[in-house]
Every structure is written in C-alpha cells, then in structure tokens.
A protein has these predicted regions:
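The feature marks the mature, well-folded catalytic cores of soluble enzymes
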Residues: 1-365
Length: 365
C-alpha cells in the first residue's frame, strides 16, 4: 500500500518528533472501570491491585467525579499550551460508556473511556487504521473520534479498520501462568485472530518499532506489515516488562538520533542494528508525588511525553529529574500538570494522536 505524505493530503505523520501541526486529544468524561478486567488483570502487578480498589471503592464502576474533573482540567491546560504553540487541536466526543456491550460470544456490563486515542488509532502517513483491540470494554471506543475521522477522510486521509475481532474466549489464555512473584510468564492474547493496540507501535520514518504485549499479538504485527507494504520495515523488539501493554512508556525518541528508555522495561541491546548510530539515554528517576493516585503503578509515565518538534517537548510539571535531563540535552521542556490523568491509563503521548506533523517519509538512520 502506498503511503502518501502529509503535504499531499494535509494529514499525516511519519515520526514522533517532526514539527507538530495538528493533534487529537482524549477526554475522560464519563470514564468507567472496564466492564471486562482480563487485560487490566494481566498488566497490573498483584501488589498494586489495592490502588484500583482505592479508585473504585465499594464496588463502584464509575471513576470518581472529582478525579474526572481534575483530569479534564489538565486536558484543558494541555490544549491551551498546544494552541499557544500554534498546534490545531481536536478533542474526543465522549460516548455513553455506561452502556453494556453484547456480541454472540460475550457480554460486558459497561465500557471504558475515550482518554487515550493513541491506543485505538494508528496513523502512519495519510493512513488511519482503527485497531482491533483486545479489551472487550473498548470495542467501540473509536466512536468517540468518529467526527474527527470523517473530517480527516474528507481532507484526503485514508481511513480503514483492521478486521474486527470476535474476542471469544479462544483469543485469550484461559489461566494466565505466573511466576512466584505474580509476574506473567506468557502473554494474555493467543494467536486466534488479529489483535493489536496502536500504542504498541512507534514511528521512525521508514522504520517502525513494535513490541509484543498483552494486547498485541504476532498476528496483529504481521497484519500491519502487510498493510504498510514495502515502503516500511516493522521491527519487533522484546520488552523486559512482564506486564507490558504499550511501548510508549518503554522507549521514547527525542529527536532524529536520540531516544530515552525505561531501564526496568527495556534493554537497548534489543534494538535492531540500525540504532547503533543513535544515542541511548536511560530514563531519569521517576518522581511519585502525593497527588499521583496511581503511585508506583504509574511506572515510567515520565517518558510518555509529547514532542512538538526536535527541541520542544511537553513533560509532566512534577518530574523535576526528567525536566533537568531534557534541558541538559539542549531541549526545551514545556511543563504541564498531568498526574490526575494517570489513573486513566496514560500521560501526554497516550492522551494524544498526531494528526499532522510537517515532514516527508524518509530513512532516519
């Protein structure tokens, strides 16, 4: 499949760092505890299960209204920052996540939320792909972005959907094996059908990195390779994180030639040889402030940043170590409070989807 440039269609992106001109932001309004917890159970370490119990006390299925309000305030701040930097911003239109879902194979009492468009939409060049997500509670999540997708399609973007998965019990390991510390020793998803979350893919021009995880299987990776065709090389890299869900709290490119990685989740030796010319930086120590309701469960969200270009990058305002690190590298960190967003399973990179970055398809190595 030929992938057109953003200049041809006024839509598209090939890297994580080219100048950002247009973006879609999520919205946690109406967020619910997932009606199906199989994915959450696989990616949350047992010692942190009490954190979720604190967020959803007494069997509640709704996110607390004060937490939603605080997170939406931070999204408003993020939008103001982006627009102040000259970026056009779209925002999700939340749907009614209290509605149950039912197929011939399964039923869930409610859905999740539209906080993280990066999870469900893969945008490479002018091609937008709706992901076949493994979480049953997220089956229709892209409906929250439908108005934006229609607009982009009218502007020339090609909008497709991966094969809609059945998500029958055959798509999941029946009894997930774990070691003595409770760490999964196998992935939740089987190879029964094509499954992937878009946030398991990272763009480096003609080269794409992807990580097998609890939400992305080999069949999904193979399908993306087939769709992208000969113009792209999709490299599968191995994670050290037994609870892995997405790649963007594991590695994050800063510009064309430098990236930062989580030492707990990733060994840079796992990268393909083309990265030998790049500088690799171990992520600075994470700061877990009192306001962060996830605490250590938030992992390495300090590197889940959003680049505006090769200099400007949005970073959580409480992450002083990360801010100093970026300044030392000659970058211009833009600070934004975002810790109230963490319980909705993401930070800046997760909470956004690049719609247009100025730049051509190229070899970045």
């Amino acid at each position: 499949m030929t992938i057109h440039t953003s200049e041809q269609n006024n839509v598209g992106t090939f890297t994580e760092w080219d100048p950002l001109e247009e973006v879609l932001l999520g919205d946690p309004l109406g967020a619910m505890k997932p009606g199906e917890m199989a994915v959450f159970d696989a990616v949350v370490p047992p010692e942190y299960e009490h954190v979720l119990d604190n967020i959803f006390p007494n069997g509640s299925r709704c996110y607390p209204s004060d937490l939603i309000d605080a997170a939406r305030k931070e999204v408003t701040e993020l939008r103001a920052i982006l627009e102040g930097e000259g970026v056009k911003v779209h925002v999700a239109q939340p749907i009614d996540f209290t509605q149950p879902l039912k197929t011939p194979d399964w039923h869930v009492p409610n859905q999740f939320c539209s906080s993280n468009p990066r999870d469900s939409l893969l945008l490479i060049g002018d091609l937008i792909v709706e992901s076949p997500m493994a979480d049953r509670s997220r089956y229709f999540e892209t409906f929250a972005y439908r108005d934006v997708l229609k607009e982009l399609n009218e502007r020339g973007a090609r909008w497709i959907s991966a094969p809609k998965p059945r998500l029958s019990d055959k798509s999941f390991v029946n009894d997930l094996k774990r070691d003595a510390d409770g760490r999964p020793t196998q992935w939740l998803t089987t190879e029964e059908e094509i499954l992937f979350d878009a946030a398991d893919f990272m763009k480096f021009g003609k080269d794409i990195l992807v990580s097998r995880s609890h939400t992305t299987n080999e069949a999904g990776i193979k399908w993306v390779r087939q769709i992208l065709g000969a113009d792209f090389t999709v490299h599968e890299v191995e994670t050290k994180n037994a609870f892995a869900m997405h790649i963007d709290d594991t590695i994050m490119p800063l510009d064309e030639g430098r990236l930062v990685y989580s030492p707990d989740y990733f060994d840079p030796a796992a990268l393909p040889d083309i990265f030998k010319t790049w500088e690799m930086f171990e992520a600075p120590e994470v700061i877990y402030s009192a306001k962060n309701r996830l605490g250590r469960l938030s992992g390495w969200l300090n590197i889940n940043m959003l680049s505006l270009d090769e200099k400007r990058i949005i970073v959580e305002s409480n992450q002083e170590h990360t801010i100093k690190f970026l300044k030392k590298l000659g970058m211009q960190p833009i600070l934004c409070e975002f810790e109230n967003y963490f319980p909705f399973v993401g930070s800046f990179h997760c909470a956004s989807l690049d719609i247009k970055r100025r730049g051509q398809l190229r070899n970045c190595f």
